[in-house]
């Protein structure tokens, strides 16, 4: 996981891009934010392994964010991509590489998603304002994590999607609750690899997110639980199920692939920026909880 800690320190060199043509990205869903990031994800068709790539040569020269291309997106895509954007904001805000610049983008994007995703889901092409706001929010979230990077939720979602063919946004939705509680531990087994803090502060960061979304609580821990409840309410509203098992993933197949998923998730480049360095046993526990829908 540490091999890809900083994409400015190259392990591999990508060919120089943009000499023959401009790279113009036109998103057709409100979720990935890829139009504003130096990231891509590819799948090895032989092994089925999903690999995220990071390099500034992958950064588009221009992004055309036009909600007209989103209007007829089906409800399932609207839901999955919208919750994907939620996880982008949450992971960027808690990332060890978060800054004042990325914080503002992440928080404002989250506020817009919670306000407009239900409308976009319900009304589709009949609510162009909601579609436009979601398009903007997804790109803003992309700008946030393009600079702050992501975390272990995305690492686990990449492998869950690759091994069991779940949509990426759904995979993130199924993992995010467990990752929030995992990251918020005040006495973690391990802190991040290169932390920009002298003591764990992720719980306080999540409390700031809760404040921005109007979640009340007497303590930071109360606010975290309120934040998770608010996220769950949004997931329920847009039809996200509560466990991996509910998506028809066979139990034996899941358990047979679990160790491979754990190892690959630990080695995923997104793990490096997570505010708490996970042990493989902790990743395994989160996968199992997500499969059975246990808190």
Predicted features and spans:
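Gly/Pro-rich interdomain helix-loop hinge
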Residues: 170-253
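Carboxylate- and glycine-rich phosphate/diphosphate-binding segment that chelates Mg2+/Mn2+
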Residues: 36-148
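Short, amphipathic C-terminal "tail helix"
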Residues: 253-295
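Flexible, glycine/charged-enriched surface loops at secondary-structure junctions
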Residues: 97-105, 121-133, 148-153, 191, ...
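Predominant activation on well-ordered alpha-helical scaffold segments within soluble catalytic domains
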Residues: 83-91, 107-118, 135-139, 153, ...
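Glycine-rich phosphate/pyrophosphate-binding beta-alpha loops
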Residues: 31, 139-172, 267-273
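Proline/glycine-rich low-complexity loops and linkers
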Residues: 1-39
């Amino acid at each position: 996981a540490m091999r890809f800690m900083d994409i400015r320190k190259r392990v591999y060199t990508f060919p120089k891009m943009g000499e023959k043509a401009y790279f113009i990205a036109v998103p057709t869903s409100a979720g990935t934010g890829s139009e504003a990031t130096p990231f891509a994800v590819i799948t090895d068709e032989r092994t089925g392994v999903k690999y995220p790539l990071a390099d500034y040569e992958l950064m588009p020269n221009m992004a055309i964010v036009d909600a007209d291309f989103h209007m007829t997106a089906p409800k399932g895509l609207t839901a999955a991509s919208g919750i994907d954007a939620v996880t982008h904001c949450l992971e960027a805000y808690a990332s060890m590489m978060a800054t004042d610049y990325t914080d503002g983008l992440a928080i404002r994007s989250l506020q817009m998603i919670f306000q407009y995703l239900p409308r976009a889901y319900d009304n589709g092409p009949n609510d162009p304002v909601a579609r436009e706001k979601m398009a903007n929010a997804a790109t803003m979230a992309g700008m946030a994590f393009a600079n702050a990077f992501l975390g272990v939720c995305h690492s686990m979602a990449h492998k869950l999607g690759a091994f069991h063919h779940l949509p990426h946004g759904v995979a993130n939705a199924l993992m995010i609750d467990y990752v929030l509680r995992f990251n918020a531990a005040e006495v973690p087994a391990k802190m991040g690899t290169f932390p920009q803090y002298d003591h764990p502060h992720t719980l306080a960061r999540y409390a700031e997110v809760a404040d921005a979304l109007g979640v009340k609580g007497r303590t930071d821990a109360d606010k975290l639980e309120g934040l998770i409840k608010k996220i769950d309410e949004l997931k329920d509203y847009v039809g996200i199920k509560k466990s991996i098992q509910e998506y028809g993933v066979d139990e034996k197949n899941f358990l047979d692939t679990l160790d491979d998923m754990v190892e690959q998730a630990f080695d995923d480049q997104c793990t490096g920026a997570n505010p708490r360095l996970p042990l493989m046993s902790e990743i395994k526990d989160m996968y199992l909880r997500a499969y059975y829908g246990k808190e």
